[in-house]
Amino acid sequence: MGAAESEVETAAREVLAKVADILEPVGFQEEAELPAQILAEFVMDSRKKDKLLCSQLQVVDFLQNFLVQEGTAQDQNPLASEDTSRQKALEAKEQWKELKATYQEHVEVITNSLTEALPKVEEAQIKQAQLQEALKQLQAKKQMAMEKLRIAQKQWQLEQEKHLQNLAEASSEVRERQTGAQQELQRLYQELGTLKQQAGQEKDKLQRHQTFLQLLYTLQGKQLFNEAEAEIPQELDLPKDKLQQVTQPQEQNTQDTMGREADNPQPVGDAGLPWLPGRQQHKEES
């Protein structure tokens, strides 16, 4: 029985060693780096292996307990027959063979699964590396595009600020010119009003002088008109051409008046006064 027990322990150790060898290539870091689909398949395979290992450990535990119980029963009952012990040993050996065959089948299934999974894992790792490289290139392109966009936005902003500054300067210059033009126009209007006022005053003054000259000429005759004519440039300070225009009608009127005086001489007693037609009519009536 000791040999059988040592054989069972040796077989259990071998099973544990094989399971450890099968599970050793895959670690937590590799699991974390695998894609979700491959990782799910690997987890399912791992669960199958864990179940198989648990069932094998249960069998080993059952065999150990069985051997312990057999040893205890033999110690308590030393009179048990040797045939019964051999029969039980043969049954245990048969069970062990069945368990070993089942274990081999499961090991083959697991090995085949791993053989099929390893190429997929390698392919997934290659795809992962390609995706990482593509992601790096995409990030680099994105960074370059963002940099170009930032430079373009900054340049556009500077151009807009410069354009707005030029517009502000042009608007200020236009406003200054408009203000100056309005002030100049207002000044010209004021000067025009002043000139119109002065022209009106000069016109009134000229009319008064003309009336005064006509009255003097009518009252005192040509000699007084000549004296008044000599005083006109001093009082009016008019140009010669305007003075000639003013005096020519007066001279014509003087000649006409002298002709009428020659035709109608004044009385002797009234030599100091100018002759008036109304006065002559008054004498005739008296």
Swiss-Prot record:
List, alphabetically, the GO terms of the cellular component aspect: cytosol; dendrite; kinetochore; Knl1/Spc105 complex; nuclear body
Q: Where's it mainly located?
A: nucleus
Keyword set includes Repressor? no
Q: Which residues form a coiled coil?
A: 85-211
Report the protein's function. Acts as a component of the outer kinetochore KNL1 complex that serves as a docking point for spindle assembly checkpoint components and mediates microtubule-kinetochore interactions. Kinetochores, consisting of a centromere-associated inner segment and a microtubule-contacting outer segment, play a crucial role in chromosome segregation by mediating the physical connection between centromeric DNA and spindle microtubules.
Q: Which domain of life is it from?
A: Eukaryota
Q: Which UniProt keywords apply?
A: Cell cycle, Cell division, Centromere, Chromosome, Coiled coil, Kinetochore, Mitosis, Nucleus
Pfam families (alphabetical): Zwint (PF15556)
Gene Ontology BP annotations: cell division; establishment of localization in cell; homologous chromosome orientation in meiotic metaphase I; mitotic sister chromatid segregation; mitotic spindle assembly checkpoint signaling; regulation of meiosis I spindle assembly checkpoint
Does this entry carry the keyword Nucleus? Answer: yes
User: Which protein are we looking at?
Assistant: Outer kinetochore KNL1 complex subunit ZWINT
Q: How does it assemble?
A: Component of the KNL1 complex composed of KNL1 and ZWINT. Part of the ten-subunit outer kinetochore KMN network that includes the KNL1, MIS12 and NDC80 complexes; a bioriented kinetochore contains approximately 150 copies of the network. Interacts with the MIS12 complex subunits MIS12 DSN1, and PMF1. Interacts with the NDC80 complex subunit NDC80 during mitosis. Interacts with ZW10. Interacts with CETN3.
Q: Which gene encodes it?
A: ZWINT
Subcellular location(s): the record lists: Nucleus; Chromosome, Centromere, Kinetochore
Q: Which organism is it from?
A: Bos taurus (Bovine)
Q: Where is this region: Disordered?
A: 230-286
Where does the record place Low complexity bias?
244-255
